[in-house]
């Protein structure tokens, strides 16, 4: 009975298709203008179908990229941190502590003995601590001219360090916000891009796994010049059920920071864990001297 029903349905569909095509043929003989209308309608339908197919392909791929983000609330690792300022390369051991939506902390610990410096990003402030000279910078994102002009807030920086897509000005990527991204399948690797005001972002993704291999954030500053920050990811390893890069390499190009074009930061993660037994806030001793906010990057550029 089911087979008969399916067969009848198939015959009916073929009959309708045949009747439609036959009707179209008769109209060609009777009225050429109607035939043109029919052809135009068919082209419109085909174009609509193609657009729907392209949009579906876009969304499926963008979801795949977004779904590669790790589930962990915490990412902790011992690191080898290499800071290049052009003429000088400084390599030192340390640690990376990140808690989603709360803090990103890089600690520099030479020979694993004593902390020499600390760079910390939270939702409300940026903190740079120089343990050697007992100085520190603590400022909101709006107080740091470089971050303010380039639209870099905590969530943008978090996405860079966590190897994931982000929507400028938003805390997280939703299925709805994925519509603001474009996947360029003609490029290899596949490029995912979006724009926000004077900012443009391009993520290079692996054609097969959709893992993010690099991201470039560019700010068009007009008279102030352009600023570009590039983050490259490699050596992916398992972190829970997902993969996370164990080599994160950042470079920058801007006129707003001294020697910025020569600066780079390379973080090699030696151990990955989701340890949560650590404090998210750093307390500063009264013995430390606070310096100006704009020195937060110029201090590094002057090394």
Which ranges hold each PLM region?
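Bacterial N-terminal signal peptides that target proteins for export
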Residues: 1-10
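N-terminal leader/targeting segments and the immediate start of mature chains
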Residues: 24-88, 293-303
């Amino acid at each position: 009975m089911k087979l008969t029903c399916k067969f009848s349905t198939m015959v009916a569909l073929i009959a309708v298709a045949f009747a439609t095509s036959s009707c179209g043929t008769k109209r060609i003989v009777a009225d050429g203008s109607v035939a043109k209308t029919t052809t135009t309608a068919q082209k419109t339908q085909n174009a609509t179908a193609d657009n729907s197919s392209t949009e579906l392909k876009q969304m499926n791929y963008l979801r795949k990229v977004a779904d590669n983000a790790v589930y962990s609330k915490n990412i902790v690792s011992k690191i080898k941190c290499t800071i290049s300022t052009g003429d000088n390369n400084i390599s030192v051991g340390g640690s990376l502590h990140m808690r989603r939506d709360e803090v990103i902390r890089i600690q520099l610990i030479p020979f694993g003995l004593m902390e020499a410096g600390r760079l910390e990003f939270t939702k409300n402030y940026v903190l740079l601590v120089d343990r050697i000279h007992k100085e520190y910078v603590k400022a909101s994102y709006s107080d740091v001219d470089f971050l303010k002009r380039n639209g870099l807030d905590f969530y943008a920086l978090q996405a860079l360090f966590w190897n994931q897509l982000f929507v400028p000005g938003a805390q997280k990527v939703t299925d709805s916000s994925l519509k603001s991204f474009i996947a360029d399948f003609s490029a290899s690797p596949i490029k995912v891009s979006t724009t926000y005001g004077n900012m443009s972002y391009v993520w290079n993704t692996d054609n097969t796994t959709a893992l993010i291999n690099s991201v470039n954030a560019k700010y068009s500053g007009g008279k102030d010049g352009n600023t570009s920050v590039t983050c490259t990811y490699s050596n992916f390893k398992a972190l829970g059920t997902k993969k996370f890069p164990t080599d994160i390499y950042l470079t920058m190009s801007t006129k707003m920071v001294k020697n910025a074009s020569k600066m780079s930061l390379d973080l090699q993660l030696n151990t990955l864990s989701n340890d949560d037994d650590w404090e998210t806030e750093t307390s500063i001793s009264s013995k430390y001297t606070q310096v100006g906010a704009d020195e937060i990057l110029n201090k590094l550029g002057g090394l």
